[in-house]
Amino acid sequence: MYQCFLDIAFEAELNTKEDPELMEIAYEQCKENVATRATAITELRTMIFERGECQPLRTDDEFLLRFLRVRNFTVPRAHKLLVRYCKFREDHKHLYQGVDLWGLTKVKDAYEGTMLDRPDVGRISIFRFGRWDPSEFPVEELVRAGMAMAEIGVRQPKLQILGGCVIVDLEGITLRHVATLTPAVAYQIVNLMGVSMPCRLRSVHIINYSWILNTFFYLFKRFIPAAAYDNIHFHGNDVKSLQQHIDPECLPPQYGGTCRCHTSIGIWFKKLRQYRDEEFDREMKNLGYIVKE
């Protein structure tokens, strides 16, 4: 019975249809007004062509809506994010161009997440890089998997509206892991967490942190916008502290939670491959990925 529920959740990951039931939440969280939405989309499209600061792959309504939602329908801010998104893709083609999408299952459980998606929390993504063995594949594969995860996630109108939280679990991180985190890699990860992606990041929670990892965070801090600092929370090894920010009902058992609807990115990719449709394949290929049968 529970597996059946999980399969329904996995299949829903490919849903790109607007949900009328989310419109009230979209107004509260994104300042989205159905009566003026089309006007905002037109203004953004006009700004793209008039300013000529970027050449996005798409300018259709559904694509532009992602950027408007994450910037609360303030058109100039949405345009600025779109410019950053296009520049990031242009400067980091190695993260997606010619990348075998299904080959990214190799990262296994270095990323995890819940699929409960409650309106007050959104999607929870968990970074567990301590579970990655640097001798198996380079750190760039983790970044590639993170970028693919973000691109696939923002296809869902639900996640565009609800956004989500990130838990960075440093259990198992050693100096061998830290040695792979160059400034370039740190810059890429920070950009994928919302600086250059149309992702609504509510908060970041660092757990299982110790002073020995100060270098780890110094690398990232350089690239984090000052305005985002208030949304970063350090919990040490205190799960109770984490639970003060995220309801245990939304957390998986390893953090004292009761949410059973969680999975690793390795399984997530396998299920996407099982349930994908022609529209998904076409979009991912247009983004530069190799999508095998």
Language-model segments: residues:
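Basic, amphipathic alpha-helical/coil surface patches used to engage anionic, phosphate-bearing ligands
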Residues: 1-293
